[in-house]
């Protein structure tokens, strides 16, 4: 599974 989501500039994006 992919790693959890991280807060980016706007919203969230998968760190994988």
Swiss-Prot record:
PTM-bearing positions, type Pyrrolidone carboxylic acid (Glu): 1
Stretch forming the signal peptide: none
Disulphide bonds in the chain: 2-16, 3-12, 8-15
Keywords of this entry: Disulfide bond, Pyrrolidone carboxylic acid, Secreted, Toxin
Record keyword Signal present: no
Record localization: Secreted
Annotated Gene Ontology cellular component terms: extracellular region
Function according to Swiss-Prot or TrEMBL: Has a sleep-inducing effect in mice when injected intraperitoneally.
Protein known as: Conotoxin ar3i
Species whose genome carries this gene: Conus araneosus
Organism lineage: Eukaryota, Metazoa, Spiralia, Lophotrochozoa, Mollusca
């Amino acid at each position: 599974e992919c790693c959890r989501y991280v807060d980016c500039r706007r919203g969230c994006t998968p760190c994988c």
